[in-house]
Amino acid sequence: MSDASRVAVVTGATSGIGKATVQALRGKGLTVYAVGRNEEALSELATTCGAKTIRADVRDTAAIVAVLNGVEVDILVNNAGILSTRAVFQDIDPAEIDAMIDVNLKAPMHLTRALLPGMVARRRGHLIFIGSIGGQSAFPNSSAYGASKAGLSLFCDNLRLDLLGSSVRVSEIVPGRVETSLYRTSIPDNQASAVLYDGYRSLQPENIARVIENVIDLPVFVDVARVEVYPTDQASGGGTMVKFQA
């Protein structure tokens, strides 16, 4: 299929990896539906790159699917995710546990379930999931987040088994440290930059969008099951990162 005939849906589209992915795919000529809650940011995407927008909480599958009624979706980028708190597990508010499981695991499962039958019937489609090294390795103060991302990773593995022979591809992109707003909600007093980014060469959202572009452009019989992406200053597994020495 030509890029102009392909249709993509990107969740968490108003910032970070999601926004960069929308811009990259629109730059290739795809029709892109950007899903997010921030009306102003969605309007900006519509104006600057011509994305179609769906203002909805990613947990509201019905609202998203209603807009996509009759649309033949070729690519679903399940990007939306939250790290709402960083604390030892015994101190986490139970509501925070529910939120991370709902957004990071249940929402992509439900949206995938809604769009997948059409892909299977058409014998084409690509499901992209933005995972996390936090779902591959243990990190302190990340029990609920890590569990949600580990569950997502195993879901991808099982989904591939369910889809064998269907020509529908499943790819999990597992980034290392990316400079996005994810941590800014969980690190207090606007300390995220000082703690995580100052002096480090972190990945940028555009780097991950480039990986997604490369994965979807491979021949349709080639399925990149999982790819881990790190800055050169971060060790595999993500637990060790050094500051850049010029």
Question: Where do the language-model regions lie?
Answer:
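Active-site helix of classical SDR
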Residues: T112, S148
